[in-house]
Every structure is written in structure tokens, then in C-alpha cells.
Amino acid sequence: MSGPSIDRTAARVGIERADTLYARILSEYGDDSVAQLGGAHLACEGVSNVLTKVLEWGRLMAYLEQSTRYVPYTDKPGGAWKYHVPADLTGSPLRDRFVRTLDTAFDTYARWIPAIEAHFRSKYLKSPDDSDGVYRSVIRAKALDTLRGLLPAATTSNVGLFGTGQAFEALLLRMFAQPLDEVRACAQQMLTELREVMPAFLARVDQPNRGGRWIDYFADTRRTFEAVARPFVAGVAAEPRGDVTLTGFDPDGELKVVASALYSTSALPDDQVLAIARGMSPDARAALLRAYAGDRANRRHKPGRAFERTSYRFDVLADYGAFRDLQRHRLLTLDWQPLGTQHGYVEPAAIEEAGALAEWRAVMEQSADLHERMLADGYRDSAPYAVVMAYRVRFYMEMNAREAMHVIELRTSPQGHPSYRRICQLMHRAIADVAGHRAIAATMQFVDHSHVELERLQSERHLEKKRSNF
């Protein structure tokens, strides 16, 4: 027997022994507790952006997704653009139209990258202090940021996941309950791969009386609720709103954060500390919050859990590209409506400046027409695949002040995409001006409200400096 064969046999024996041990421990200590102690890495390749949102739903997992900001989608493996065609279109005349429409979107995207780069090179001249590599990377990132709205939600990507056995079980149960063929097929592939390394943790996923009942519960509840809820909202026109609306906050929230900060340094009951906070002057409360936040040297220095005492709920209308970035903040409470075309689309100024406006709008129109046709023909679940990322989607984000500090400071940093920078700048202003929590907003000292022309410039300079030190 050769060396590699011996290694594989030894590995298999090791897994079988571990599986036997886990099975015994599971029976003695309980499934859920033990399933938190083992983890696995998994790579999902060639999955649509619709599917990535399902994969990235769980809070207690780690994800790494291929970026549309830095990686151009210009290669054609096997002669086809990288997007997913829904299986339920097989045999339908709409399939050919779907392919033609998405091919046009990708053709337009790829064809305009050189022209948009040339436009930005003429608008933003290279500094003598920057290397050719830094300048080239900055211009390329700016062009891809501008054009990513042409990419459809069907665009495929690669996602890396890490999670415990318990987290993967929860993810797979949700995926098997989904109506989309792509999601369920991916779940089956994931289950097969994961059983190579953690079979005991996933034993009940496809057992009819265990995971099967769970899956039926998810699927049946979704269908029943949609049928019950639809009459209440169907046909109701959306009232006009801004891109960011603070729909929920506690007028006494800032006062309660002060009380929570005092609580940890006292031996007093919660309600008594709150009464003390009410008796403080606004200046005294602001000074106490400044002391609690401390001398923050960078955005990673965050105050303690007292900031979790008050929360903010934002209703957001943003392009799907920006939503994809903000949705990754999964520890807060976030949900979204189906992606469609009824809310219109964003149109970067550089598109018109570079002469691409007519083709941009043609792609938008074709995407909307295909989406509407898919809805009319009964492909409601698959219709979002046809929508390009410039179209806007409505979602809400509800987070406590500590989470808001993290999200808003991170997503307004100069290297961020202009779309989500603007969204988070509006959130920060709403906390101060609408909620009136000016002292809390003031502790978010690394929120950047500046207008940045070349978003990646400082970041690329920093990266080059780091590389030169190795």
C-alpha cells in the first residue's frame, strides 16, 4: 500500500473513531451543546448573489465573500458569463430571454470598464508621490464601483464559511425549506461535504421525524403567513420616504445609557440609578458619556455594554449593491423585502460624464422588463435573479448604540463605497438630530462625513507601505 493510501486510510479511521466518540457524547450530554464545540470551513463556489444572502443569514458564523468592488467580472469560463440561470426556467421560452438580457448586462459592464477607467484617469491625475501600481489599483476600483450596478443578482460569486456543527445544521434546515432550486441543491452539496468531517453533528438534518419536520415547519409557515398577510398590503402604494428614515428610537435612550453606565460602578437597583440619571443636567450626562467612551485612538476602541441600552430602527432604501455590504452586519436585526424594480435605480454621475448613459439605461429597462415578465408568468421566487444591482431594495436595520457605532464608523470610512457611506452618514445625523441623542452621536468620533473622490487612495497607499516593509 502506498504512502498516500495509508494516509487516507488513517484519516478515515480517525474520522470514524471521532464519529463514534461524538455519538456517545451526544447521547450523554445532548445534541445542541456538543454541536457547538466542533467547527468546519466550507467553500461555496459559483453561487448567485441571491443565494449568498441565504448563506449569510446566520449570526453565529463567519463569512468571506468575493468582492464586486475589486474583482472585475470579465472572464467567461466555458464561454459563458458568470451568472446563474434558474432551473425552473428550463423548457420555458423565458429562458432564452433571460440569457439574452443578462448577457447584454455583462457585455455592457465589461465593454465600459476601459472607457470608465480612461475617464477617471483624465479626471484624477496621478500624484508624483504614488506608484503606478497604487494609481492603477485606485482607478480600477473606482471604475468597478461605478459599473457594478450593471451586474444582476444572478451574478455568481465565491463564499467561504466557517461555523460550528450547530450553526451549519440551522443553516441547512433553512436552506432545504427555501423555494429556490439553487438554494436546495447547494444545501444538499454542503450536507454531503460536511458529513465527511462532522457527520455526527448533522445526523438529524435529513431524518424525516427530526430535520424533516423542521424543514416542513419553515416552509409551511412561510406559505401560510404570506397567504394571510398579502391581502393587507397588496395594492397599497408606498408613501414617499427618504433613503434613510429613523422609524424607532427611545426619547429617553441617552438618559438610560447614562444610567447603565452608572449601574456597573454602584450597588444600587436599576430603577434607582435611572432616577439619579434623570436628575443630572444634560452637560453632566454628556460628560459622563465622554468619560465612559474614553480616549478612543481608533474605531476599534469601543465603549462598554451600557451603550446597548438604547436602540435605533432605520428604514433604508438603497441600491442592491450597498444592501449586500450592509447586510453582512448580521449581529444586529435586519430584514429585507423581495428585490424588484419598483423603487427605481441609482445612476452614478460618472456614467453620464463618460458617455455611457444610454447603454446604462437600456440595461435598466431590459432588466425591469424581464423581471415584470417573470412575475407575470408565475416565476415570483426566481424573478429577483433578473434584477441588476443598481435597482433599489427596501430593508430595515435595528441596532443598539454600540452596534451603531461599529457599523457607522466602519461604513463611513474613506475607502468605503459611496452608496453605503452616504446611507451611514444619514444614520449618524438622524441619531443626533431626529432622536436628539447628540451626546451618543458625539462619541462616534470616527464617523467620516467628508466627500471622497478616490475612495481607495489612502487604503492602497497604506497597503503598499505595508508590503514594502516585508
What are these regions, as identified by a protein language model?
Residues M1-F470:
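A conserved ligand/cofactor-binding region detector
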